[in-house]
Structure formats: structure tokens, C-alpha cells
Amino acid sequence: MYTAGEEEIEAIARVIRSGALFRYGENSECNRFEARYARHLGVEHFALAASGTYGLAAGLIGLGIGPGDEVLVPAHTYMATATAVLSVGAIPVIVDIDESLTIDPAALRDAIGPRTKAVIPVHMWGAACNMNAIMDIAKKRGLLVLEDVCQGIGGGYEGKKLGSIGHAGAYSFNYFKNMTSGEGGGIATSDPKVAERARCAIDPCHFYWQGRSDSIKPFAGIGARASELMGAMLNVQLDRLDGIIEAMRAEKKKVLAGTRHLGNLGLTPSPMNSPDDDCAAQVMYLLPSEQAAQTFSKTIPSVIAGKTGRHNFTQWDQVLMHEGAHHPALNPYTLPENKGLRLTYADDLGKGSLDILNRTVMIAMNPAHGDADIDDMIHNIDAAARVALENASLDDVEVRKAAPVDLQKFDSVN
């Protein structure tokens, strides 16, 4: 969470004082947010859910994904991207990333099989995927595209908001995201049928609220409704979002400019697919070796992408162990409909991805940073680069005081 204050407190207090915490009622905060956020994204429909994970699941349900289908997911994303696929009875197929830390379009194209139905491009750490290439491949091969925007809220790609480019987009409003209500999520689309199915997945009583005759064919959903408390806080957070993103973009621009000379040492900024539309939540650098990345991250507060726990496929126990459901009879890996799908994961899976991840370091931006904070960050990056890439001694460099890495946010592991 970057910013929250009296406005959020007052908005939540107003809902509590009203006694109307259920989202279906007059002057609904949730309805207001859904309409406002849909306009912000440039889509026709937005539906709130209890979490980003359920937003992903609702998006898959909305698109008609289920048993018998494969869904392509990147090797670097929070495990919920893959487990959401399992939750609808489909099988996740893991695809390599490129140096942007997003799904590699060439690897995506090569991974398409006869029963591949969809792809989930993940705008990881707020960095946009190469959506032009992905949408071109999807159109030619008949794939559905569900953007995972859980970490990319506020970002865009070539002038379009993330999540508005594919057939649907899933969002998270978890505490660690660019816009937050503590927990929460949602699904965006301009397809009314996808929106209706997603809303029915989120709320098993959705059919009743609008009248049975006006709804689609009913199916059993799971209650993942938002509350008015979520809607109230998000309406305030939405007012803050553009300012948060603008501040981080300005900071990142200064940091990249101030460290450009370090490319001569081997500290290379990670490539971006649409840098002007970047969320700018992180500055990412690619180093020449794992050892250099480790030395860099030990010198100043920073995170190695390959050490972010369940953001890497090697930590997805439910997937790798084929434990895809709470009951054996529902396990997608043993469903007869999934016979013939790619159910196993090779021992050498993702070697290229792991090499990139273990050589990429990330430094978090923060809209609260002032000029002095940014100057200190640039100074520290210079110092860490000298230690990691020129074998300078820690005694030979000055490391200025900096905030520690939020290990909980990054699920960081040693």
C-alpha cells in the first residue's frame, strides 16, 4: 500500500454509519466503483470480487475455460495464476519468459498445442507484456487472452490500459498492489456474455438480483462478493491512482538516467515493452551472472527476481505435485476429460527463465520518495554495481541509508 489516509477512513466510516454494508442497495459504493473503473480502463464491464485470485478464476469461467483445455501461463508469476487454471478444471502449461520478465511471445507460439484454449499474459511487477505480438498469435491460433493485471494496475501498453487489450483482464486490490482495499479483485471485459458469466461465478445469486428471465443459463457459482467497505475504499484509491503512477514514473526515469553510465560495467536495465506506459513500480537490471546479482543484492536493499518464492514456477507445489483440487475426484490432473493433455513438467523446464530470473535485480519505487531519497538510491546503485562488477571492496564504497526490502511483498527466499 502506497497511500491511505483520512479520506479512506471517512469513506469507510460513512458506510458503517449508514448501516448498509451489503453491496446491493441504493447508492452502492461497489456499483459506483465498477462503473468508474470500467470507464478508467476503457471497457464496458467491470465486476468486483473478493480477491485477485478469484478475479482470475471468474475470468476463466467467463471465457468458458474448463476440463479438456490447456492454458498457457508464464514461468514467472504468482502461483495464483496457475492455481486459478486448476480451479476451473483446466491444465496450466508453463511457458518461458524473456528478459522483460514477461511471457516470451516466441515461446508462447511454440507452446501452443492442439488443445490449448487460452493464454494468461501476466504484467509482472507492473511491466507490460508484448501485447501486440501476443494478440497477433492469439488471433492466428484461435486463443482466448486473459490478462493478469494483478501487479499492473495503473499501467498501460501503447496508450491502452492493461487489461483492456485481451478478451478479459483480472485485477487484484491486495494490500501490496498499486491500488488497494486490503484484499479484493475483479474482472474487466467488453464482452457482455463474458461479464455475465463472470458475475455469476462471483455471486451464486446473481441470477436473482436482476431477474431470472434476463440472465444467462444458470450454473453453480461460489460466493466471492465484494462488500461496500471495499467499494468505498477503492473509490478513494482510484482518485489517487494516477498521481501514484505519475510519481513512480518520474522517479524511475530519474533513476535510469542517473545510472545509465553503469551499462559500461554490465548493469543493463531490463527491456520494457511499453516504457512510457509502465507502472514503474520497479527498476530492474540484468546482470551478467548469478554471482554478480547476489553480490549486488547483498550490497544494497534489492531483490533478485529468482528469489521471489511462489512467484517462480519452481515453488508451485500444487502444480508440480499434481495436487490440483481439494478432493481427488475433482483433480484436473486425473480427470478423464484431460487425458491426452500435457500433464507432466520436464526436469529441465524453464532453464532459460531461471537464468534470466537469477540475474535480474529489482529496486522498488515509491511515490513518497523525495529528491534526496532518489539521489541516495542512484548513489547506492552505483556503489553496488562497483562491488558486484568491478570487485570493489565494501570498504571502498559508501552505502547510504535506505529502507529495507519488504520481504513479505516479494515472498523473498534466500
Listing of model-derived features with the role each one plays in the protein:
Residues 12, 37, 55, 71, ...:
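Generic structural signal for small/hydrophobic residues in well-ordered secondary structure
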Residues 152-158, 165-282:
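Active-site region of PLP-dependent enzymes
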Residues 1-22, 143, 362-364:
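N-terminal "arm"/small-domain region of PLP-dependent enzymes with the aminotransferase-like
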Residues 271-274, 278-291, 308-329, 358-372:
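Conserved PLP-binding active-site segment of the aspartate aminotransferase-like
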Residues 22-70, 84-86, 94, 160:
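Phosphate-binding glycine-rich loop
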Residues 61, 65-149, 156, 413:
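PLP-dependent aminotransferase-like
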Residues 206-212, 254, 258, 297-361, ...:
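Conserved PLP cofactor-binding pocket of PLP-dependent enzymes
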